[in-house]
Amino acid sequence: MASSTTNNPALDLDSDTPENPGHELAQFASGCFWGSELRFQRVVGVIKTEVGYSQGHVHDPNYRLVCSGTTNHSEVVRVQFDPQVCPYSDLLSVFWSRHDPTTLNRQGGDVGTQYRSGIYYYNEEQDCLAKKSKEAKQKEFKDKRVVTEILPAKRFYRAEEYHQQYLEKGGGNGNKQSAQKGCNDPIKCYG
């Protein structure tokens, strides 16, 4: 991570780079990051996923602090992908399919600003595609407003290790779920 360009590193843009120069990064917030991460893990062309916190104002947050509602961070999945195999538009389709983008600061029983809907982009092309996809999604909802925010990706703070690939590792009850590419098994989210 480069040095801070503001007085608060949490407000800086995410300057991390993919491990391979031909790959890209993307950040998505769609409620609890466990189920979202597993869905992205299954996408052909996704090289790596990490869950963490972004878009907040507190440097080096942790899960307990984010859940307190005082940091303004979102729970996000950061995806490293090969755009030659998996176009960004495919990731947007996965994002929209994983949650209700019309509920503000909640997904199901999970309530709080950390569960808001957001697309956090790394370049102008991602910004443009995200906005077009939101416009298309809004047409599907006649009487509801899509509340998904689309903003530049701020610094990514990797969540605690036990959150990484949580459902693939068995979650809270030891029932491992497949992260195999192309898997369409239902995703069961449990703590």
UniProtKB/Swiss-Prot annotation:
It is an enzyme of class 1 (oxidoreductase). Residues 1-20, 168-191 are annotated as: Disordered. GO terms for cellular component: cytoplasm. Keywords: Oxidoreductase. InterPro entries: Met_Sox_Rdtase_MsrA_dom (IPR002569), Met_Sox_Rdtase_MsrA_sf (IPR036509), MsrA_MetSO_reductase (IPR050162). It comes from the Eukaryota. GO terms for molecular function: L-methionine-(S)-S-oxide reductase activity; peptide-methionine (S)-S-oxide reductase activity. Its EC number is 1.8.4.11. It catalyses: L-methionyl-[protein] + [thioredoxin]-disulfide + H2O = L-methionyl-(S)-S-oxide-[protein] + [thioredoxin]-dithiol; [thioredoxin]-disulfide + L-methionine + H2O = L-methionine (S)-S-oxide + [thioredoxin]-dithiol. GO terms for biological process: cellular response to oxidative stress. Coiled coil: none annotated. It holds the Pfam family PMSR. Belongs to the MsrA Met sulfoxide reductase family. Has an important function as a repair enzyme for proteins that have been inactivated by oxidation. Catalyzes the reversible oxidation-reduction of methionine sulfoxide in proteins to methionine. This is Peptide methionine sulfoxide reductase. It comes from Fragaria ananassa (Strawberry).
